[in-house]
Amino acid sequence: MTAFRTVYPDIIGAYEKIRFSTKNLPESQFLYGEQAPEPLLVTENGVQFATYLNEGLMTGIFLDQKEVRGRLVDGFAVGKTVLNMFSYTGAFSVAAAMGGAVATTSVDLAKRSLPKTTEQFEVNHLNLAPQKIIVMDVFDYFKYASRKGLSYDMIILDPPSFARNKKKVFSVAKNYGELVKDSIDILTDKGTLIASTNAANLSLAKYKKMVITALQEKNVRYKITDTYQLPADFQVNPNFPEGNYLKVLFIEIEK
């Protein structure tokens, strides 16, 4: 810690995240300097996000997705209805709303997603009326939306690499194709799918193949218009390509 403080003397305050299993240490703890206010409001692409630096491993926003959120803020979602699956704190939804989306729907199984997402809209002074925040299993919501005849101009998929609940075990490597197929069922006839994963054990080539296979099985016309990986300020060791874990595809789909 002495060496860190010597190299980075301008750090106002520091928190530690414990990413290995331990019985004696918390996932997160304050180390030195000034403690951040809660929430700590950070600004990205002109959008404010409420973050909590000492709330477990996650802070409320994943900075590696800033370029994708920037596209949404810059008008990619203007005039569109947006469905944000595995929405966490709703960062994609807020970015889309700030960029002119007419309505957003955020779906996540975690109960905390409701107050967390509401807060993100509120700190940006956005009207909550056209923003739906739903606590539900994503696969159950696909069935619900299909049964109710709901459809969306844009669907964002950003699942965890692995997740488990009472009904299902999900892994990107085995189940991502299901997400793509279910999305197509409730996408408008000419819609956009933003497909994302942070699975480090899956190369970009294999990920693209997985997504394309699902699209072909649904017999739709599609075009991958943009591909994103980690932003330039996220260092990647060329000898460890798995470190460039983020993979995001922008796909235009016509049914």
Residue ranges and their predicted role:
Residues 1-62, 70:
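Non-catalytic substrate-recognition/targeting regions of SAM-dependent transferases
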Residues 63-80:
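Conserved alpha-helix/loop element of class I SAM-dependent methyltransferases that forms part
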Residues 78-88:
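Conserved class I S-adenosyl-L-methionine
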Residues 89-101:
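Conserved SAM-binding loop of SAM-dependent methyltransferases across substrates and taxa
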Residues 103-108:
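Conserved SAM-binding motif I beta-strand of class I
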Residues 112-156:
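S-adenosyl-L-methionine
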Residues 138-214:
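S-adenosylmethionine
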Residues 178, 192-255:
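C-terminal catalytic and target-recognition region of SAM-dependent MTase-like enzymes
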